């Protein structure tokens, strides 16, 4: 076969022994053999491209499927009651009442964001937004979970600058508010940053759309941007293998394929075009084109339908000349959608696309057969059973083994680490902690994002959870939070995942919303490492068991493996997103103190001497070891119930969860947010260091008007929730005072808290 000859099905049958680069495409010997067994011949070049991308770790979940099934086993019918779409769809969809539905999901774009930080992050946002669009919803907000190497490491500035500009540039151009997230710096993410993007959308329940191709004769319409060479191999090579640590400081870039290139303005009109198409009832089924491009869209639509599909591949609008069928099928060019449309609606469909200046092309049709066939200028280059491509890839039950080093890690507690003893040392610890890259203000980052575009943002960064209004008439809204702790998960993956769930659940609750559903993005090292698979297995079980205890379902998510450079893996990082519902956003609870004169500060929950895995141990001693804080999910539920009742009855004027940095961090953030000072009272007999810096879970700082203090504390006592009167808001005060120990002016706190990131990256 010459270099210019197309490898057709006829040719593949006639030349069964032709050498094929299946290993270069990420397939193993036995996987290639299985493809030949399925087809009864060797695959064509185009078929090989399809199977390689769809059987990649990123698309097939071949190493995680056996563990992800645990989510289904632990989800009850009661938990599923309000779930309209779940695991397996483009994004989860939840019925939130009054005829409204919300769809949300978290996705990773980790490896591309190291190779090309701006485009990697930008297209990560664009991809997750299209997942939301594909469910029939209008996207309304985005969030992000970012993990970078040490803040002062040489390459971190390049990655941070590109990623932050990419997230902001794409999201801002779409007109979507970025309402929160997390940014973490840790040396384990050097060379392997995590860029996890969340998007949420809203629709009426009856507007739900799903990805399936049914009805023989229905047309397949590709619409959006033209197809180019960008992103080819993204899921089979870039997202499904580790970065090579050879080659000096290249990070293995020489072997990596092109990163996708995004155009947010094309996506912006694509959103409006899709919404018009939905409103007109012109769409039977729809799928966005993201990872694996047309290979994914065609095989998944056909596999979910009731027949087959035929595609005329040469009709695909291309922006590069000389593209091969394999390249067209593998391209991950952005801003593209694929719809199933009845023949009588094609003209109307095209008119809507023309109105929005969106390129649309009829590229094929649904057939009454059982195969997906694809032709190239009249010659068949693909003839496959679509389920074997989309859903019946290899499944590996990889070895799972608790690392031998785990015992030593757990035994290495913080018990022997020096603690501050004097008042001066306590003050110095506070200032060092809030100025550290681990805890300092993310204002330098978040100010690059538009948080209030569209006018429906109620709470955003620096609140614990973001809140968006979805119904102007009733005030109904949603709250979202994403959280993760790689440090705790490294110590105990089961507990670490539950701590992330507990914090995200609590962050939604402190806004006054009721937590309803969960999405996740599970970021781990190589699945070929039994120790990594043990971490993954334990984290999945911890998260699933935690959701079952709280009674909220996992609606979907993402797994990102191979997050390591050479043999060095990232900290295991299960990102958990929680969606909550608030019936009236006017009763949301803000973070800042001082809404009413002389508020009483009350600490909800118990404080213990828990410092293993804490930010204090990291900042002061560069230490990681021991046992993470205990998690009590029943207490988290009680705490959420108390906060909901307090919001409805107007009993609290501010609330802030306690997590990294403990009470000291929460007080500083709440005081600076409200631009008012306060006095903190160390309980009699309590250790000031433990009181200020413990990271015990299940705690919230609330500000209560003096007139409501008796009523509020009485409710807590009656419900069995521990509470401690911990301080008072001093109206007009210019300092935060820990009574009897030290006092720091607000100006000094703000300088320490807000000066770090601009100095590093500004």
Curated annotation (Swiss-Prot):
Coiled coil: none annotated. GO terms for cellular component: cytoplasm. One of its GO terms (biological process) is 'de novo' IMP biosynthetic process. Mg(2+) 1 binds at residues 107, 558. InterPro entries: PRibForGlyAmidine_synth_PurL, PurL_linker, PurM-like_C_dom, PurM-like_C_sf, PurM-like_N, PurM-like_N_sf. CDD domains: PurL_repeat1, PurL_repeat2. Pathway: Purine metabolism; IMP biosynthesis via de novo pathway; 5-amino-1-(5-phospho-D-ribosyl)imidazole from N(2)-formyl-N(1)-(5-phospho-D-ribosyl)glycinamide: step 1/2. The active site is at residues 58, 109. Substrate binds at residues 108-111, 130, 260, 332-334, 560. Its EC number is 6.3.5.3. It holds the Pfam family FGAR-AT_linker. It is found in: Cytoplasm. It catalyses: N(2)-formyl-N(1)-(5-phospho-beta-D-ribosyl)glycinamide + L-glutamine + ATP + H2O = 2-formamido-N(1)-(5-O-phospho-beta-D-ribosyl)acetamidine + L-glutamate + ADP + phosphate + H(+). It is an enzyme of class 6 (ligase). Monomer. Part of the FGAM synthase complex composed of 1 PurL, 1 PurQ and 2 PurS subunits. Part of the phosphoribosylformylglycinamidine synthase complex involved in the purines biosynthetic pathway. Catalyzes the ATP-dependent conversion of formylglycinamide ribonucleotide (FGAR) and glutamine to yield formylglycinamidine ribonucleotide (FGAM) and glutamate. The FGAM synthase complex is composed of three subunits. PurQ produces an ammonia molecule by converting glutamine to glutamate. PurL transfers the ammonia molecule to FGAR to form FGAM in an ATP-dependent manner. Belongs to the FGAMS family. This is Phosphoribosylformylglycinamidine synthase subunit PurL. The gene is purL.
């Amino acid at each position: 076969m010459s270099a210019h000859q197309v490898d057709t099905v006829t040719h593949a049958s006639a030349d069964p022994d032709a050498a094929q680069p299946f290993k270069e495409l990420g397939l193993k010997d036995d996987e290639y053999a299985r493809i030949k067994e399925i087809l009864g011949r060797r695959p064509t070049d185009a078929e090989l491209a399809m199977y390689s991308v769809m059987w990649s770790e990123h698309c097939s979940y071949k190493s995680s499927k056996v563990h992800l099934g645990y989510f289904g086993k632990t989800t009850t019918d009661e938990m599923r009651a309000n779930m309209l779409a779940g695991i397996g769809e483009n994004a989860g969809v939840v019925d939130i009442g009054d005829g409204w539905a919300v769809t949300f999901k978290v996705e990773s774009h980790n490896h591309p964001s190291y190779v090309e930080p701006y485009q990697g992050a930008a297209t990560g946002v664009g991809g997750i937004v299209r997942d939301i669009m594909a469910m029939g919803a209008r996207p309304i907000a985005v969030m992000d979970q970012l993990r970078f190497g040490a803040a002062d490491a040489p390459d971190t500035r390049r990655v941070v600058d590109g990623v932050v500009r990419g997230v902001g540039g794409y999201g801002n151009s779409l007109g979507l508010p970025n309402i929160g997230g997390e940014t973490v710096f840790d040396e384990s993410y050097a060379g392997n940053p995590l860029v996890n993007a969340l998007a949420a959308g809203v629709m009426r329940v009856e507007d739900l759309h799903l990805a399936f191709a049914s009805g023989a004769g229905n047309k397949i319409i590709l619409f959006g941007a033209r197809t180019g060479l960008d992103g080819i191999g993204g899921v089979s090579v870039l997202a499904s293998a580790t970065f090579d640590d050879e080659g000096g400081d290249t990070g293995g870039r020489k072997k990596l394929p092109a990163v996708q290139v995004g155009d947010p303005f094309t996506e912006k009109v694509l959103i409006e075009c899709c919404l018009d198409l939905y409103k007109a009832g012109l769409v039977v089924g729809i799928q966005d084109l993201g990872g694996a491009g047309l290979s994914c869209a065609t095989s998944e639509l056909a596999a979910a339908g009731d027949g087959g599909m035929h595609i005329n591949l040469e009709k695909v609008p291309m922006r590069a000349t000389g593209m091969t069928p394999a390249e067209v099928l593998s391209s991950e060019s952005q801003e593209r959608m694929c719809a199933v449309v009845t023949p009588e609606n094609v003209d109307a469909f095209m008119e809507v696309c023309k109105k929005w200046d969106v390129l649309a092309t009829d590229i094929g049709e649904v057939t009454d057969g059982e195969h997906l066939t694809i032709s190239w200028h009249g010659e068949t280059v693909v003839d496959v059973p679509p389920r074997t491509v989309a859903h019946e890839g290899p499944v590996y039950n990889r070895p799972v083994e608790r690392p031998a080093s785990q015992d030593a890690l757990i035994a290495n507690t913080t018990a022997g680490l020096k603690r501050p003893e004097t008042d001066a040392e306590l003050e110095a610890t506070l200032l060092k902690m809030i100025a550290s890259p681990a805890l300092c203000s993310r204002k330098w980052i978040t100010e690059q994002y538009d948080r209030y575009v569209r006018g429906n943002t109620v709470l955003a960064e620096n609140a614990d959870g973001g809140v968006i209004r979805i119904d102007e008439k009733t005030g109904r809204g949603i709250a979202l939070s994403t959280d993760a702790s790689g440090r705790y998960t490294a110590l105990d993956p089961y507990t670490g995942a539950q701590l992330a769930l507990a914090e995200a659940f609590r962050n939604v609750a402190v806004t006054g919303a009721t937590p309803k559903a969960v999405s996740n993005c599970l970021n781990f090292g190589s699945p070929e490492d039994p120790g990594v698979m043990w971490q993954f297995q334990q984290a999945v079980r911890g998260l699933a068991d935690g959701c079952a205890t709280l009674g909220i379902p996992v609606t979907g998510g993402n797994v990102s493996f191979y997050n390591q450079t050479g043999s060095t893996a990232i900290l295991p990082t299960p990102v958990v997103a929680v969606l909550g519902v608030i019936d009236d956003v006017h009763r949301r609870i803000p973070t800042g103190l001082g809404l009413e004169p002389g508020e009483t500060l009350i600490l909800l929950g118990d404080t213990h001497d828990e410092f293993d895995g804490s930010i204090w141990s990291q900042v002061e001693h560069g230490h990681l070891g021991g046992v993470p804080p205990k998690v009590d999910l029943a207490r988290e539920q009680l705490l959420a119930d108390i906060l909901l009742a307090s919001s409805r009855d107007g009993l609290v004027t501010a609330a802030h969860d306690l997590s990294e940095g403990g009470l000291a961090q929460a007080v500083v953030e709440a005081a600076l947010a409200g631009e008012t000072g306060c006095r903190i009272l160390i309980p009699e007999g309590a250790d000031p260091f433990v009181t200020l810096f413990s990271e015990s879970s299940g705690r919230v700082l609330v500000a209560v008007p003096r007139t409501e203090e008796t009523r509020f504390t009485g409710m807590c006592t009656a419900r069995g929730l521990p509470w401690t009167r911990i301080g008072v808001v001093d109206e007009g005060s210019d300092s935060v005072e820990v009574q009897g120990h030290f006092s720091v002016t607000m100006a000094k706190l703000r300088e320490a808290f807000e000066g770090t990131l601009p100095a590093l990256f500004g």
